[in-house]
Amino acid sequence: AVAAGTVMLFADYYSYTEVNGVVVILGFLWNRLWGVYSDPNYGAVFSAITIIMSLYFYKDAKKPLKALYIINIVLQICYIAFSDSRTGMVSLFCALLVYVYLTALRSKKLEAKKAFARGVICVLLAVTAAVASFAAIKVVSVSTSEFKKWQYEHIISSDKDKTDAQKEKDKQKLEIGRQSNDINGDVSNRRFAIWGSGLEIFKTKPLTGVTFRNYVPYAEDKLPDTYLVNNDFIEFHSMHNSFVDILVSQGILGVVIIAAYIILVLVLIFKNFFKFKGEKYKYNTALLSIIAPIFASMMFYSETFYMNTGGAFLFWLALGYLIQSVTSKNSEAKEITPGK
């Protein structure tokens, strides 16, 4: 998908169609690389997860495979840059914080350090890695924009087969990413308004909610002026935040149930997480680092709960494996071989 999307970027290919009332976008449109994903945010979060998996397998891989893992990491960073997904960048930041911190914590080079000093060093390494990923994304974005400007000045602008209107349209594609006027000064890209509308709906039925698939019919009937169904864009069928989704869909009862579940799972994981060493610890770290970016993405779009998406599948799969792994006794745990 990343390779296909990259070809679409440099070929300026895009497709904009409507299927059963749902807009389907492919390629490079509105200065963002959608690729073959229904939403570039999905692709960017998958890229963050793929980077973590490449790092996990890299250390124990043979040299030819190491080169492929490096190339893969570069491609995934490129996709996040071209997609201009802030959700993807936040997810990658969280994934690297978790992975680098936990990996460094058990590094043999830091074993001699005192606990406090080791902790500080691990935090610094994790933050450095996360910030470096942001810098890499920015470099890719800026350098690609400069290349496209060169391409326009030396090739497209002198193309006699293109009309002035076509050339002007090509000129608008020179920048990678949304510009400030694209989101009309709204840094949340409508999310704040959607969340506010969700709270309006929640107040009408706070205890049990209105159910997830009933947002639009309920709002049209009870709150026809709320932003969810009355705006200058489209009707929104989700809250673009998984926890606001729960609040509106299942009310206070749903929030209490989910909060209790999250707390119990976290206690179960971290009560046992640091009991393991070696490959089992690395394996658990990789699983937790897959869960972290998906959990972070839940703050910015509807994911995991009520959804049948690739991200939901990965989240529950990784969480299931992690819980099984950390709750198994050392004597019961199967030997995990290093990734090749």
Each language-model region and where it sits:
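A membrane-periplasm/extracellular boundary helix in multi-pass inner-membrane enzymes
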Residues: 103-182, 196-204, 212
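Hydrophobic transmembrane alpha-helices and their immediate junctions
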Residues: 97, 101-106, 113, 223-228, ...
